Amino acid sequence: MKSLPIFAVLATAIFVTMPARAEDWKPEPGFVSLYNGKDLTGWGYRDKEQKVLETFDGKAEASDGRYSAKPSILVVNAHNAEKGPKLRQLWTTQVFPKNFILKIEFRAVVNADSGIFLRKPQLQCRDYLVAGPYKTLTKYKPQDWNTIIVTVKDNVAHCECNGEVLEDALKLPESGPIGLEADRDQMEYRHIQIKELP
């Protein structure tokens, strides 16, 4: 039996472990992507009244370095802040007044602290088993990709991580954008998609 040349084995291994390119992923039927996988188009900073202060269309990085666009991945790095407040929220420039389903995948470094803002209220998105508050999750995968699904109906959000309930009935205002928080350490988000419901 002939053995494969070592370069062929290495090439296969590299191909298998390469991260997916931005164009390899598409939203599920009926969903619209909120992150284009290339830059921060459609995202920006808002003030406390949620008025848009700054937008990052066509830019690979936020003005304070807290958020950056990598192929397929939106990186949140609290340690990159060169200026501005300790806490930051990156918001969609679009608002969502209707019922919807939001799907988002995240990967946290150890003890990372971020959050997903739903119109205004925050759903904690962290390295849950270390940073809490949902330390009893059994399907959470530390330092790996996890999926959050938020279903909003009549201004109430049902939130799950890998099929386990995080919040059963989180009350929301009637309209608002989607936001991602930079608080502690690094968090990565990908496959951010939303589908409006009747």
Predicted regions and their residues:
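Carbohydrate-interacting regions of secretory-pathway proteins
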Residues: 20-198
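Bacterial N-terminal signal peptides
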Residues: 7-15
